[in-house]
Each structure stands twice: as structure tokens, then as C-alpha cells.
């Protein structure tokens, strides 16, 4: 046996007592059988049987026992000791077991030592405190366990730590709860709730200066129960408290039926309910938030966000964004939760941030989406020739005009037409911004609105460049129908177009003749009858020079093209006469002011501006009349009328007519390609541009029938010619 102890000591000092080595050795020795049930009992047994052995072995066993006690809990020790009792017959093992039972017995003796009445009294005080007004205003756990009728399960109350320290008997707890006037137990004895006493009678419209004895004197009667207290509350209200609800109801009936008046006034009385724990007439306002309050100490901002859908229809304080928000655990959700969905003051404060953000976003985006169709819808919607031609001619610098249309200094050289376009642009932009400012407050709606607007802009702008590009290569044929008003009859229209083909070829030939002989035309005489005709021709060029210098360069190119063709047709009509000296250029200046307005009106005819005398109408009248003179116009050379072309060119090009003289043989096709590639502006000579216009006019229908003098809207300002 001694050897066994030494082996155990050598192996067990540094090992776990639960190691398999102990269990393997135990079956081989009958004395060590209790080891399987509890090592501590075996050590006690060894210590008892080894009384004659050296003290070192006993000390070793005690050390091992101490180490074992540290490693195991008391509950595990108790279970092991109880199993050891069953198999061991030695009485010394019962020491620890007796100790554990003594601890239990001591607790029982302490309960029995305290009288039952004292226990009930302590339990009653604890339960009444749990259901008191002060505790329920802070105890979120009890509030969370209440149902819609403020009932709490009794087993919930019995499991509270304060109650468990006193007793665990549910019958005793139920008995104490039924005896307490502060709570009310249901019929089954399963639930309990705070008792709402209605034992206070409120007397209204009684001044505070009224002596309290007079108020109490109202209830001094045999038919009225005894008054417990009488006090002034506020606003001329007096509170008279009675013992129970029955007494309060009896006193209320007594005042209404017997007393009726006090100080010459009818008595105004009502019964007030005493809320023993909360000032808000019950808990029904907190039902929606009871399950989120326990989390409030950990995440205080999670509860109000969760409660927003519940209180959304009843947000009484949504207008006041300055109301301070309390995030304390104090459960007053009636005031706290309606304010909780508005931690962001900018949303409540007049919806300023969504509106200003929308306006700024629209202002930043007004460059690209709106510039695309700012100029093009002008001539697309119009039926006039000026804007239609502008759409076809100005494609070369369409990108430049598209992105710089809001650049006012860049367009200061063309105020006539660009001013109108800019005005239309600003009006449309302003109306769009007003709709955006007032139309939407929500972010989702704003996004949908912006997407819908951009889709509409894309539908407007995408098809349009394709149509304009399709017009660009063939402007002579696509623009035939839009340049002229409908004529009364088609019979007079068809011969005009046939004469156009016969005559424009001669016009082109005449152009090259006048370019070759340009040096010799200044001193040639012109007949007296032709003086006014030349003056009118100069007036045409002079009048078109002033507005066209102020327009867009594309418009100026188109307008000068038309006027020079008309000038050449007038020159050919004037060649039938004998030559006399040309009238001085000063004769054209008095009529310049009078002829400028019809030209401007013709320019703005397509943009729905009121016109007085468009040239198209006069052409329709001319086409309906039969030719008066024979078609022997181009027999004579055109050099006599070179001054009519040179002088207006000087006015247009600011004294640079030499450009048209130096480049007389430049091909019209090359000039047309330059015209499309962006070389339109003040750099292009007007004389060279005239060749392009006359080349284009071969396919146009503005030519005058043979032998017929050009008659347009400006003839009303031209003095009549002398008879032949």
C-alpha cells in the first residue's frame, strides 16, 4: 500500500487527477475503487488508513486534495461525494456531505427563523415598490413585459432577483399580491397589473383664495363619505381624495344631486384616476415601442429609427426642428419618439436642401443637354428660308455654336438674330428651372424627373443632327418648297422654273465676263432711265450689308447670296438701255435707312417676326405676270454695271474690294467647300462669296423670267423710273 501511494505521488503531483493513469491503476487495487467515483474520497480514505505511516505521505495527500478542490466546483464535488457514499462503507467520507447538507439546512433554518408575517411584509413592500410610480418610470423591463391591458405574468415577477432573494414560493407571492391595494390580480391568478384608482374628485372653477374649510364643508354630510385630503391643484382646480373608488363615486353623485351649487355657481366636478406609476393615463401609447427599449442603452439611435413607421401618421412635432431631442433611457416615448425620426434638421426646415440642390444641379447641367437643341429647333420649326439655310450652312461649326451659345462676348458681333435666339433660350431655361424648383421635394421624384427630361432632350436632339446633315450635302433641292409661299396657280409657276434653267446658265457666263472686264467698268456711261435702276440695285446691296454684318456668319452668307443674285438679275434688265454715267454712290445712302428694315424683316421672317413686305410675295406676283420684254438681255456685255457690284462690296467688306478682283478664277466648288468647313466669317471676301451664291442659284427658283424687271418689296421705296 505504501508503494502504491509513492507511485501515485510520483505520477500525480504534476498531472491532472482526471488522467487515465489513475483509472487504469484503480481497477487493479480494491482499496482504490472509490477513485472512479471521486478522487477526494479516496484521498480521505487513504489518509484515514495510513495513520501509522510517515507524516510526509499525509501532507502529500492533503496537498493533492487542496489542488483538487481548487480545480473543481462545489456542485461537482457534491455530486461526486454523493456517489461515493453509495459504495463506501467507511463513515469518514461523510464529512464533506454533512457539511453541504448543513449549509442547506442553515438556509432553511434562517427562513424558518424569520416569521411568515415579516416575510409577507417584506415581500409586499418589494412588490409595491416594483409597481410604484417611481419604479415603473424607470423599469423598462416591466414595461416591456406588459400586454395591452398592462398585465404582467406573475411568474415574471417571481423571477425577479429582488423577489427571489426573499422567496421562491409562487403561492406566497400570489397571496401577497392579492392583499396589496397597489396592484390588481386577474381572476385566474396568473397576471397582475398596477391598480388604477379613481378616488379623486376634481372641483373646477373654485378660486385659490377660497378657504380650505369651505371646500371641505361641501362634503360634511351623512350621505357623503369621509374626505382623506383636500388641496388646491392649479388653475382654480381642487383635488379631494377619498379612500376608494366607491367613496369617490358616492361623493361625486352627492355633489351633483344634492349640493349642486357653491358660492353662487353650479358645481363643476369630475373624477380623476390616480396613475400610481405614470402620468400619462396608462401605457397604451408605449405599446409600439416596448420591445425596442431594452436595446436603447446599447444603441440609443436604433430605437427611434425603428419606430418611425409606427409614429409616422401622428407626427405632431414635425414642424419644430429646434426642439431638443433627449436620448436618455427615460421611457417617455409620447414626446420622445415623434421627434426621433427627425435627427436631420435640414429636412424639416422648409425642404430647403432638396430644392437648392435640384436648382444647382440643373444649372450645372444646362450646358450640354440644352445646348444641343437650342439653335436647331429655331430653324427646324420655322418654314422660312433664312433659318433653313442657316441650319444647312452652319453645320461646320455646329459644335462651336453648340457649346458657346451662352458666351455673350463671343456673339456680340451678331446682335440681330442671336439676341432673339438667346432670349428664347433663356425663357425656356427659366421655365424649366421653375418647374424643377417647385415640382419635386423628394429625392426619388427628382431623379425620375431629371431622367424623364433628359430622355425628352435626347429624343429632340438625336434625330436632328441627322436631318441637318442630310440637308447639308443637297441644300439646293431640299429647300425649294420651304423658301416660297404657295402660289395661286401652278401654270404660272412651271414656266418660271423652266425659264430659270435657261437663264441661270447665262447668268453664270455673265459672271465670268464681268470678272474679266472688271477694271474697265468705272467710266462707262449708263442711260438716264437706268440710273434709278442702278440706284435700286445698290440699295439692295447696301440694305443687306448692314443687317448681314450683324447676323451670324451663316445667315450673312445666305442672305448675301440671295441679294447678289437679285442684283445680277437687275443688272441684266438694265442692259437693254443705252449707257449714261452712273449715279454717284451718295445717291444710295439716303435710301439706305429706308431699305434696311425690309431686309431685316426678311431675315426674321422664319422666326415668326411680323413682316411688312417679304420678297417672296413680290416674286409670286412677278411670276404671275407675262414677260414684257424679249429675252435679248445677255447680248450686251455686263461690264457697264461693275460699279453696282463694287460699291456695295466696299460697304460690306469695309473697303476691301480687291479680294474679289484678285481671285476671279477661283472655283465655286472650292469656295463652297470652304463655306462648309468653317471659313465663314469676316475673313471671306464678299465678292468671292458672290460666285458661290450665283453657282448655287443655278438650281434655285429666285430667277426672274426673261424680259421681266425684278419687282420686290423694296420697290415701294424706290422712285419710279421714267418712261422709255
Curated annotation (Swiss-Prot):
Annotated stretches, region: Disordered: 374-477, 568-600, 623-724
Entry-annotated residues carrying N-acetylmethionine: 1
Biased composition (Polar residues): 415-437, 574-600
Chain spans, region Interaction with PABPC1: 13-22
Gene3D superfamilies named among the record's database cross-references: Winged helix-like DNA-binding domain superfamily/Winged helix DNA-binding domain
Primary localization: cytoplasm
The keyword Cell inner membrane belongs to this UniProt entry's keyword annotation: no
Start and end residues of each stretch annotated as Interaction with the poly-A tract of mRNA: 111-303
Protein name: La-related protein 4
Gene name of this polypeptide: LARP4
Subcellular locations according to the entry: Cytoplasm, Stress granule; Cytoplasm, Cytosol
Low complexity compositional bias, start-end: 381-394
Subunit structure: Interacts (via N-terminal region) with PABPC1. Interacts with RACK1.
RRM domain location: 203-281
UniProt keyword Lipoprotein, yes or no: no
InterPro entries the record matches: La_dom_prot (IPR045180), La_HTH (IPR006630), LARP4_RRM (IPR034903), RBD_domain_sf (IPR035979), WH-like_DNA-bd_sf (IPR036388), WH_DNA-bd_sf (IPR036390)
SMART domains per record: LA
Species this chain originates from: Homo sapiens
Taxonomic lineage: Eukaryota, Metazoa, Chordata, Craniata, Vertebrata
Residues bearing the modification Phosphothreonine: 578-579, 649
Record-annotated HTH La-type RNA-binding domain positions: 113-202
Residues found modified as Phosphoserine: 392, 505, 583, 597, 647, 722
Amino acid at each position: 500500500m505504501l508503494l502504491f501511494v509513492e507511485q501515485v505521488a510520483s505520477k500525480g503531483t504534476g498531472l491532472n487527477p482526471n488522467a487515465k493513469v489513475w483509472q487504469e491503476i484503480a481497477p487493479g487495487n480494491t482499496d482504490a475503487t472509490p477513485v472512479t467515483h471521486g478522487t477526494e474520497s479516496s484521498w480521505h480514505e487513504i489518509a484515514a488508513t495510513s495513520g501509522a505511516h510517515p507524516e510526509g505521505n499525509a501532507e502529500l495527500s492533503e496537498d493533492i486534495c487542496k489542488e483538487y478542490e481548487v480545480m473543481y466546483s462545489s456542485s461537482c464535488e457534491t455530486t461526486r461525494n454523493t456517489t461515493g457514499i453509495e459504495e463506501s462503507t467507511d463513515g469518514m467520507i461523510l464529512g464533506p456531505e454533512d457539511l453541504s447538507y448543513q449549509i442547506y439546512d442553515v438556509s432553511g433554518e434562517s427562513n424558518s427563523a424569520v416569521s411568515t408575517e415579516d416575510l409577507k411584509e417584506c415581500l409586499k413592500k418589494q412588490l409595491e415598490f416594483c409597481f410604484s410610480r417611481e419604479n415603473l418610470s424607470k423599469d423598462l423591463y416591466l414595461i416591456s413585459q406588459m400586454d395591452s391591458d398592462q398585465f404582467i405574468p406573475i411568474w415574471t415577477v417571481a423571477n425577479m432577483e429582488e423577489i427571489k432573494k426573499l422567496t421562491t414560493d409562487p403561492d406566497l407571492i400570489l397571496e401577497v399580491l392579492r392583499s396589496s391595494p397597489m396592484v390588481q390580480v386577474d381572476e385566474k391568478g396568473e397576471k397582475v397589473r398596477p391598480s388604477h384608482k379613481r378616488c379623486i374628485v376634481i372641483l373646477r372653477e373654485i378660486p385659490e383664495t377660497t378657504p380650505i374649510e369651505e371646500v371641505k364643508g361641501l362634503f360634511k354630510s351623512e350621505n357623503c363619505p369621509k374626505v382623506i385630503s383636500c388641496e388646491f391643484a392649479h388653475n382654480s382646480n381642487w383635488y379631494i381624495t377619498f379612500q376608494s373608488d366607491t367613496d369617490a363615486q358616492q361623493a361625486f353623485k352627492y355633489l351633483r344631486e344634492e349640493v349642486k351649487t357653491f358660492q353662487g355657481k353650479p358645481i363643476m366636478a369630475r373624477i380623476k384616476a390616480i396613475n400610481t406609476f405614470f402620468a400619462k393615463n396608462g401605457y397604451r401609447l408605449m405599446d409600439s415601442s416596448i420591445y425596442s427599449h431594452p436595446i436603447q442603452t446599447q444603441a440609443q439611435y436604433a430605437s427611434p429609427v425603428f419606430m418611425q413607421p409606427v409614429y409616422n401618421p401622428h407626427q405632431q412635432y414635425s414642424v419644430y426642428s429646434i426642439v431638443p431631442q433627449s436620448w436618455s433611457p427615460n421611457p417617455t416615448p409620447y414626446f420622445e419618439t415623434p421627434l426621433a425620426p427627425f435627427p436631420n434638421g435640414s429636412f424639416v426646415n422648409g425642404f430647403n436642401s432638396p430644392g437648392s440642390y435640384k436648382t444647382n444641379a440643373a444649372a450645372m447641367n444646362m450646358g450640354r443637354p440644352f445646348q444641343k437643341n437650342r439653335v436647331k429647333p429655331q430653324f427646324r420649326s420655322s418654314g422660312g428660308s433664312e433659318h433653313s439655310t442657316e441650319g444647312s450652312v452652319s453645320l461646320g461649326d455646329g459644335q462651336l455654336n453648340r457649346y458657346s451659345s451662352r458666351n455673350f462676348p463671343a456673339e456680340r458681333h451678331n446682335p440681330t438674330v442671336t439676341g432673339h435666339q438667346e432670349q428664347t433660350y433663356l425663357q425656356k431655361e427659366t421655365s424649366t428651372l421653375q418647374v424643377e424648383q417647385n415640382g419635386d421635394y423628394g429625392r426619388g421624384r427628382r431623379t425620375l424627373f431629371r431622367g424623364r427630361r433628359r430622355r425628352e432632350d435626347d429624343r429632340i436632339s438625336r434625330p436632328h443632327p441627322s436631318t441637318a446633315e442630310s440637308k447639308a450635302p443637297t441644300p439646293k433641292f431640299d429647300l425649294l418648297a420651304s423658301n416660297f409661299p404657295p402660289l395661286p396657280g401652278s401654270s404660272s409657276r412651271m414656266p418660271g422654273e423652266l425659264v430659270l434653267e435657261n437663264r441661270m446658265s447665262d447668268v453664270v457666263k455673265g459672271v465670268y465676263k464681268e470678272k474679266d472686264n472688271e477694271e474697265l467698268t468705272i467710266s462707262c456711261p449708263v442711260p438716264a432711265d437706268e440710273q434709278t435702276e442702278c440706284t435700286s440695285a445698290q440699295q439692295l446691296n447696301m440694305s443687306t450689308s448692314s443687317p448681314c454684318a450683324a447676323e451670324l456668319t451663316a445667315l450673312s452668307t445666305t442672305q448675301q447670296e440671295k441679294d447678289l443674285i437679285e442684283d445680277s438679275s437687275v443688272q441684266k434688265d438694265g442692259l437693254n438701255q443705252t449707257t449714261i454715267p452712273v449715279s454717284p454712290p451718295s445717291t444710295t445712302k439716303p435710301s439706305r435707312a429706308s431699305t434696311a428694315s425690309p431686309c431685316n424683316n426678311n431675315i426674321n421672317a422664319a422666326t415668326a417676326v411680323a413682316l411688312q413686305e417679304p420678297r417672296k410675295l413680290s416674286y409670286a406676283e412677278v411670276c404671275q405676270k407675262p414677260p414684257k420684254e424679249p429675252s435679248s438681255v445677255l447680248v450686251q456685255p455686263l461690264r457697264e454695271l461693275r460699279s453696282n457690284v463694287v460699291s456695295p462690296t466696299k460697304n460690306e467688306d469695309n473697303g476691301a474690294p480687291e479680294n474679289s478682283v484678285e481671285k476671279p478664277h477661283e472655283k465655286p466648288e472650292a469656295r463652297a467647300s470652304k463655306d462648309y468647313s468653317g471659313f465663314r466669317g469676316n475673313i471671306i471676301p464678299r465678292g468671292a462669296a458672290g460666285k458661290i451664291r450665283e453657282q448655287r442659284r443655278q438650281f434655285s427658283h429666285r430667277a426672274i423670267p426673261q424680259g421681266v424687271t425684278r419687282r420686290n418689296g423694296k420697290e415701294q421705296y424706290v422712285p419710279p423710273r421714267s418712261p422709255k
